[in-house]
Regions:
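Compositionally biased terminal segments of proteins
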Residues: 1-306
Length: 306
């Protein structure tokens, strides 16, 4: 593993307990998978977090997120670290950069997908990371099915080699569960891009990103061809794994008339990301009805083919 990446993980593990000192955040994404869910098959250099109180109104939630990021900055200052907060348009401060002389870690809150599908768990740092970096602690983390659901959406959407590596490792360790698929449907429904573009979209060229931002991160060798095979398998498998109820829900949402009772998550209709998605679809239907219908038909046709 590359020393620069390892130094970044060391910084990440230094600040992680302060990031989760209060009970409003839980860890998600690659750091949750590789440092807590698995035994560090690859390094992970960012802290992606979910804001847990999904019932709060948007403005109140954003204020709480901004305040907690500021508090984290204050908590890590005695460690001799520098921090700066990054503002996003109309959202306030949603990212915190933590730096020392050699490394930088980004703490980023998903301000749209607030709340969780499943109850949060607490897990210890994996044994390999604990031994290598000499620390032990546990953090609040998304449940395994939900942790991978977000990763599956990311792997189809941005298609970063890191995401596809995590998918490959998932296949190596047992594969996609029905619970992951159910959570995946919720995360796909709350995603900012149109559902057919994510689920049935085009493949990106990964070669440059593989060399620039992936090589040196993994414990095991992993070729570009391996990642491409994992992506192809994922694209083929996920649409076929959807149940009739899940397909019906996604098609109903695409026409802005979702049947929420088709989902196992009883509070899905109240989750901010899904409410926002439905609101945007209703606006899309009013302003561009032909494009709206075409997008829904594209999803229906794609799901009917599998």
């Amino acid at each position: 593993m590359d020393k620069t990446y390892a130094d970044t993980v060391r910084l990440l593990l230094t600040v992680a307990p302060d990031v989760f000192a209060n009970d409003i955040f839980a860890i998600k994404g690659g750091t949750g998978i590789n440092l807590f869910g698995q035994n560090m098959p690859r390094l992970s250099i960012d802290i992606d977090v979910v804001y847990l109180p999904w019932q709060l109104p948007r403005d109140e939630a954003l204020r709480a997120i901004n305040q907690e990021l500021a508090a984290i900055g204050e908590r890590v200052q005695p460690l001799g670290l520098q921090t700066r907060r990054i503002c996003a348009k109309d959202l306030g401060e949603t990212k915190l950069i933590v730096e020392n002389e050699t490394s930088q870690v980004k703490v980023e809150v998903n301000v749209v997908f607030r709340g969780t599908v499943l109850p949060v768990e607490h897990r210890p740092l994996c044994a390999k990371a604990s031994d290598l970096f000499g620390v032990e602690f546990e953090l609040p983390i998304l449940a395994q099915d939900e942790l991978y659901a977000g990763k599956l959406v990311a792997a189809l959407d941005r298609q970063h080699p890191r995401d596809l590596f995590d998918v490959w490792q998932l296949y190596e360790s047992g594969g996609i569960t029905d619970g992951m698929v159910e959570c995946f449907v919720v995360y796909l429904a709350g995603h900012n891009r149109p559902t057919p573009e994510v689920l049935l979209g085009n493949d990106k060229d990964l070669a440059a990103e593989y060399d620039r931002a992936f090589v040196g991160m993994t414990e095991l060798p992993c070729s570009l061809e391996t990642l491409l095979e994992a992506r192809a398998r994922l694209r083929q498998e996920l649409p076929r794994r959807l149940t009739a109820a899940q397909k019906q829900f996604l098609c109903g949402l695409a026409r802005a008339v979702p049947d929420w009772f088709l989902l196992q998550c009883r509070h899905a209709a109240e989750m901010p990301a899904l409410r926002w998605k439905l609101s945007n679809l209703e606006t899309f239907r009013k302003r561009r009805p032909s494009d709206f219908s075409a997008q829904a038909a594209l999803l229906e046709a794609g799901l009917n083919r599998v």
